[in-house]
Amino acid sequence: LQRVPIWLANGEERLGIAFHPKSSWLTERDYQPPDLPLMIGVVRGKNYLHASIRQPWLVFHELVHGYDWLVLGKQQKYGIDAGLYERAMKSGKYVSALHWDSRYRKPYHAANRMELFAETSEAFFGTNDIYPFVRAELRAHDPKLFRELASLWNVDLDGQRRSSRALAKTLESSPLISGLEEAAKGSDESAAPAYAPTRRYARCNIEGWNVLIGPELEKSPKLAEKARRLLRRDLHYVKRYVPAEAVKKLKRTKIWLEKDNPDVPYLTFHASDKHLASRGDNVDKAGAVEIGNAENYLRWFGREPSIILHMLAYAYLQSEIDGGNDDLATALSRARKSGRYDKVLRFDGQRVRHPALANQYEFFAELSETYFGTNDHYPFIRGELKEADGKTCKIISRLWTSK
């Protein structure tokens, strides 16, 4: 994919973003591209910025076309097998599909074999704006095409399954929010401290957030840099999707980045200093997000791409909505009674009870992921939430003061 150059131009309104296997197509129409045989053209930046809000994997879509031409077709043609497209169309699975705006219409997959490959690759690796939106849905919707994509992209599905099982096991055994009970009722128990003092942490500003990096992680500079880079990406998306006034409040939440805290094998939001004291941890982490294991944070990004937003939603609910309100309680009660969240598709293809049903914190955080980003459980994106539970969708929007 890195062999495909990207041309960022300015002001040309006639052309959006597209892969051009031959630059002559551009020059013949009086464009002035760089002297390259092929490229992705992003000709009008404003349009690209607008389109990428609902199509966050838009550039990847065009890179897939580049991969199709360069690798599969060996720079002579688009190489994706026509038979793959014909089988998919004959199956009847791509006649009508839910789109990002909660409306059903003919999906772009049906346009031709190149678009089928690009659209389904978006879902395979990221988030598409047309159903199937994510990998789990693609696997359930069209398992044959799913396997063909894995082969075309040389993906180790067995390794992916092992990683997914490890994440599912970690989520079941290690809560993403810690200290809720202690925050509610208080506790005077404490254990002997066994942690590096705050003064030993390196501090940096990432997208406006105060980030503290543990001394052990600092000893692994490559890992630390990868974690910072991913965190920058995650926080950038929070800023891009969440309303500006709410972002200002979210930036008050510190983020602690550790190499390997055995008490936090993934991520957590520390709701109580009492809970931290009871296990001998640093009470300065109270009210903050902790990425307790940098390796796991990097490892599981593809399955939980909005996990940082999830963490920050806990902080927002605690500080701005007093841990919940009547609207949220009503929505949660209605969701529990409806049964629609009792057995939903999860990132690993399993059907499980939605973690949103646990309490108001989980309900708000999970569905904020869905509303602004991509969840790891159905409903995966806002369009599905709006279709499945429109009342809750409006409540989540209102709590974030979103338009």
Could you tell me what each predicted segment is?
Residues 1-90, 199, 207, 214, ...:
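Acidic/His-rich structured neighborhood in mature extracellular/periplasmic domains
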Residues 212-219:
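Terminal transmembrane helix and immediately flanking juxtamembrane interfaces
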Residues 220-224:
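A short interface-forming secondary-structure element
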Residues 107-109, 202-203, 245-248, 354-355:
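A general structural signal for short secondary-structure junctions and capping/turn motifs
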Residues 12, 72, 124, 128, ...:
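Short loop/turn segments at secondary-structure transitions that flank enzyme active sites
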Residues 188-203:
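Short acidic, Pro/Gly- and aromatic-enriched capping/linker segments at domain boundaries
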